[in-house]
């Protein structure tokens, strides 16, 4: 972002969004199916303390826009991401905290104690999830995550 920049959607983006809005329930249900599959099939790793699964508060409704897992630390996260990449799974770390991003370092300052921001960001992995994901693709992702985590932890 810089001076004079405009981030309003153009006509092409609006047309693309409109097509998605017309099928919003179908898209959401497809993504929810994948989300539930991941959650159910990774629950054993969670029960064994090898990773943490997403928490959706009771008063909230998920649209399944992403599925993440939290691993014990950045070392395990790095190994799991490498394993997934080597096995054709496009998983990524979730975010870089603003205070440690280049612009944050240059322009900002962290206020208070960094009790959670950095450590939590170093544990998160986002798994691939998309509309129309097949049962085979879902199982491939889960199998690779299980293999990677069991090899590391």
Regions found by a protein language model. Give the residues of each.
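PLP-dependent aminotransferase class I/II
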Residues: 1-153
């Amino acid at each position: 972002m810089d001076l004079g920049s405009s981030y309003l959607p153009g006509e092409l983006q609006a047309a693309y969004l409109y097509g998605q809005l017309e099928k919003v329930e179908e898209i959401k249900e497809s993504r929810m199916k994948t989300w539930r599959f991941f959650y159910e099939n990774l629950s054993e790793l969670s029960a064994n303390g090898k990773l943490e699964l997403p928490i959706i508060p009771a008063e909230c409704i998920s649209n399944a826009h992403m599925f993440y897992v939290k691993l014990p630390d950045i070392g395990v996260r790095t190994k799991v991401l490498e394993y997934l990449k080597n096995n054709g799974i496009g998983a990524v770390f979730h975010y870089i905290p603003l205070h440690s991003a280049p612009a944050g370092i240059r322009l900002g300052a962290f206020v208070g104690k960094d009790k959670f921001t950095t450590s939590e960001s170093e544990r998160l992995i986002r798994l691939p999830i998309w509309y129309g994901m097949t049962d085979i693709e879902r199982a491939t992702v889960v199998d690779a995550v299980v293999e990677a985590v069991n090899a590391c932890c």
